[in-house]
Amino acid sequence: STVELNTPINPKEPFTRYKYPTLNLLKKYEDNGAYIDEEEQIANKNRIIEVLGNFGVQIKTIRATVGPTITLYEIQPAEGVRISKIKNLEDDIALSLAALGIRIIAPIPGKGTIGIEVPNAKANIVSMESILNSKKFQETKMELPIALGKTITNEVFMVDLAKIPHLLVAGATGQGKSVGLNAIITSLLYKKHPNELKLVLIDPKKVEFSVYSRITNKFMAAVPDEE
């Protein structure tokens, strides 16, 4: 059955009568799981080993953990190699991999290894539908669950907004600020009854949040002065 978004909610109405949004409202993307092929992995490993070797940095092992958008290359440096020396080679490694940008995690917390995060040549889409349809989101006991994406190991990444006293979202144009805010709002709309949640959305440009005008009667707190 369809969800009538313009019908006001009675504060005394039982929660059981409310129809939550259905997942078929969200676009579904096929996930074949093949984020990066073996050939690309081997080529990147060899380039990393070559660049480090050119600067006198020897490593014991290198392994790859493939995620939807990035691959983590985990290296174990040889004895006596300074971590700072590897971190200083970040630009050289990025150049050899022809990557837009890499991130070096030195060391990886809880491990005696150094991580090099490299963007996949072809990033897979992590859809909101796949996250909200996950067992982790469906069965969460968080008070205000927000699903923000997936980790490098392809696990759904969620946090409880109720446990975050302040949240600042910042970044350059096109880096996904609006996408992140939409993910937060969508997560809450799919989990909370209108009697549990009220939103105050301030959108000076009247563009980013205009799509939420349809839920005014249910989730929007009244603001007397538009200015």
Give the positions of each predicted feature:
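P-loop NTPase catalytic phosphate-binding loop
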Residues: 17-18, 108-113, 117, 136-227
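Low-complexity, intrinsically disordered P/S/T-rich segments
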Residues: 1-166
